[in-house]
Amino acid sequence: MEDLALRPKTLDEYIGQERLKQKLRVYLEAAKARKEPLEHLLLFGPPGLGKTTLAHVIAHELGVNLRVTSGPAIEKPGDLAAILANSLEEGDILFIDEIHRLSRQAEEHLYPAMEDFVMDIVIGQGPAARTIRLELPRFTLIGATTRPGLITAPLLSRFGIVEHLEYYTPEELAQGVMRDARLLGVRITEEAALEIGRRSRGTMRVAKRLFRRVRDFAQVAGEEVITRERALEALAALGLDELGLEKRDREILEVLILRFGGGPVGLATLATALSEDPGTLEEVHEPYLIRQGLLKRTPRGRVATELAYRHLGYPPPVGPLLEP
């Protein structure tokens, strides 16, 4: 319930994503002026950047209802029909998270719903089967995905607006922490909020989670104000360093450097050495390490960068590191 109370309701309250918000203000004002539903919108980007929150904000700005579901929850056309025909009114928004995981059958039934606001359902089987056409209210579909490459071309082409959410700066994340603190009645210095922001991997969800944990440490210590020093102590206790690396992130780099001489080493081999699932390594840990300039993917395998050596306190290898 705390998260719901902290969720922004308007674009002005929504922190970050300034370029996207500027465009959304135009789209929303135009739709309201024409008294039409907003065009179907696809939001894509890494997890934790606020796609679901933005859908709630858009619904609030338009003064319409929001129905939230996910791709895996819509297994068959009947599930989709039940939502579209029974849960939505004129102008309402249907938000489908992980829309890339829609079944092919459900996705194909979504096409006419998006284009013409109708849906054909087959009743019965064999010679007795008949088709019933459902007239649907004019609605807006907001799809969200972390894997835009898995969105099929026919589905992608039916979105009138396609937008990418970017990682947040430490300063924007600090603003988010300060906002949550203010709403919760927690006193925190700007310096402490910035230290949390610097370790939040560019992700608002992580910043909010770290703020709650730092608040726990401060509360147990009996401190009325979260200072920079208290925040640093709490973040260190959580195993986070100044780049926001967790223990597992550092283990990946250390194994790469100490056991494989900095690489290159194949993903499967590295995963085996770490007793880790290759998919988890590739999708959860590597993106941030690459974005921080600590790891490179090359045709021959993973390579630790000079920055990785220096960050962990190891002397970098003599000569240039292997390049792709």
Swiss-Prot record:
Lineage: Bacteria, Thermotogati, Deinococcota, Deinococci, Thermales
Protein name per Swiss-Prot or TrEMBL: Holliday junction branch migration complex subunit RuvB
Organism: Thermus thermophilus (strain ATCC 27634 / DSM 579 / HB8)
Region Head domain (RuvB-H), annotated ranges: 242-324
Family matches, as SMART domains: AAA (SM00382)
Effect the entry attributes to changing Y309R: Suitable for crystallization
Job of this protein: The RuvA-RuvB-RuvC complex processes Holliday junction (HJ) DNA during genetic recombination and DNA repair, while the RuvA-RuvB complex plays an important role in the rescue of blocked DNA replication forks via replication fork reversal (RFR). RuvA specifically binds to HJ cruciform DNA, conferring on it an open structure. The RuvB hexamer acts as an ATP-dependent pump, pulling dsDNA into and through the RuvAB complex. RuvB forms 2 homohexamers on either side of HJ DNA bound by 1 or 2 RuvA tetramers; 4 subunits per hexamer contact DNA at a time. RuvB is a Mg(2+)-dependent, DNA-dependent ATPase with an equal preference for supercoiled and linear dsDNA; all (d)NTPs tested were efficiently hydrolyzed. Promotes Holliday junction (HJ) dissociation at 60 degrees Celsius in the presence of ATP but not ATP-gamma-S or ADP; (d)ATP, (d)CTP and dTTP also power dissociation in the absence of any RuvA. RuvA stimulates the ATPase of RuvB in the presence of dsDNA and HJ branch migration by RuvB. Excess RuvB stimulates some branch migration in vitro even in the presence of mutant RuvA.
Names of the cofactor(s): Mg(2+)
UniProt: Mg(2+) binding residues: T52
EC number from the UniProt entry: 3.6.4.-
Keyword list, A-Z: ATP-binding, Cytoplasm, DNA damage, DNA recombination, DNA repair, DNA-binding, Hydrolase, Nucleotide-binding
GO molecular function: ATP binding; ATP hydrolysis activity; four-way junction DNA binding; four-way junction helicase activity
